[in-house]
A protein has these predicted regions:
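N-terminal secretory signal peptides
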Residues: 1-33, 41-53
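Exported/periplasmic ABC-transporter solute-binding proteins
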Residues: 29-31, 57-124, 128-142, 148-339
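Serine/proline-rich low-complexity intrinsically disordered segments, especially terminal tails, linkers
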Residues: 14, 22, 36, 61-64, ...
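N-terminal hydrophobic signal/anchor transmembrane helix of membrane proteins
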Residues: 38-39, 168
């Protein structure tokens, strides 16, 4: 500890140095020490604020432009794990690669086993992030939801797709309802060729299925399996590419016109620009949920998902729509309203 400022050295030498000189040096050291204390405290507070105000402290991407790059944040370490929606797994994986490049002491890994499984897993604490096409309120109990924090990272359009040999290129919501309830079974009933419709559905628990059925059936209960129930969006891609006379549904990022055709709904093309104002009715917000007590690595990765590094470019590159581009919002009940 430095000597007390009030102390006056006698006018003698100490170790060959005049007492007056020692006092002057003490004052200079004291001032330098105070400056170091101040700067250290300021940097510490800035670091705490930077970590505390983002990550699992709020929801939505509206503050993304103000967050900057998580890659520039203070170095973090740890393991981030996720499960959930396969629809935007590619986006999460692409973002994870960039994040790990900038933060080599963090590993980010996971699976796309469906929104329901992802939400159940994050609520149980078996993963640190649950990815979902639907609000947690639609899949979990209220006491589970209250312990989670939602981060809305993108919006995705979803639409019906048909085999290459199918001549139908536009269906109404009423026609889709008939097909996916088993009431319409032949393509000629909707203006196509005389051929039996092969319905490829997603398994129960899929957020893509929940979003599609909510748009087509509203509040009506549906329990129609179709000819097959598939686990993931990638499985639908594969099956649609090898099956004639089939119909299914996929998010826009999984459209592949070399394997199947995406068709209009009510005369509206499945385009991102038509989703932003709700002209195209089948769409969902992509959610990433974490625990309120999430670790720093998870918080930092979610901050990165909302940063300009992801929202400014990567979201659209991966076939999604930035939340900031939307002119409307959709709540947990499915109600759409203007921003």
């Amino acid at each position: 500890m430095l000597p007390d400022r009030g102390r006056i050295f006698p006018n003698s030498k100490a170790g060959g140095v005049p007492a007056s000189r020692m006092y002057e040096r003490k004052i200079m050291l004291d001032q330098a020490y105070s400056r170091r204390q101040f700067l250290g405290l300021a940097c510490g507070l800035a670091s705490i604020v930077g970590l505390g105000l983002v990550g699992c402290g709020g929801s939505g991407a509206s503050d993304a432009a103000d967050k900057g790059s998580a890659a520039a944040a203070e170095s973090v370490s740890g393991e981030v794990t996720y499960d959930g929606a396969s629809s935007f797994q590619a986006l999460v994986e692409a973002a994870a690669e960039k994040f790990m490049d900038a933060n080599p002491d963090v590993s980010v890994s996971g699976s796309g086993n469906g929104s329901g499984k992802g939400l159940t897993a994050v609520a149980a604490g078996t993963v640190t992030i649950g990815n979902s096409d639907v609000f947690a309120e639609t899949k979990l109990e209220a006491d589970q939801v209250k312990n989670l924090v939602d981060h809305e990272v993108a919006v995705v359009g979803m639409g019906p797709v048909v085999s290459k040999n199918v001549t139908v290129d536009d269906l109404s919501l009423e026609q889709l309802k008939g097909i996916f309830s088993g009431q319409i079974t032949n393509w000629k009933e909707v203006g196509g060729d005389d051929a039996t419709i092969v319905v490829l559905n997603r398994k129960a628990g899929s957020g893509t299925r929940a979003t599609f059925e909510a748009a087509v059936f509203g509040d009506e209960a549906v329990d129609f399996k179709g000819d097959a129930e598939l686990d993931k969006s990638g499985d639908v891609q594969t099956q649609m590419g090898s099956t004639d006379n089939a119909i299914s549904y996929l998010d826009f990022s999984h459209f592949d016109d070399s394997k199947f055709n995406a068709i209009k709904v009510e005369g509206v093309e499945p385009k991102s620009k038509n989703v932003t104002d709700d002209s195209f009715k089948i769409w969902a917000t992509e959610h990433m949920y974490c625990s309120k007590d999430a670790d720093e690595a998870t918080k930092a990765f979610l901050e990165f998902m909302l940063s300009d590094d992801v929202q400014g470019k990567l979201v659209e590159e991966q076939g999604f729509i930035p939340v900031s581009a939307m002119k409307v919002v959709k709540d947990a009940s499915g109600k759409v309203s203007a921003k």
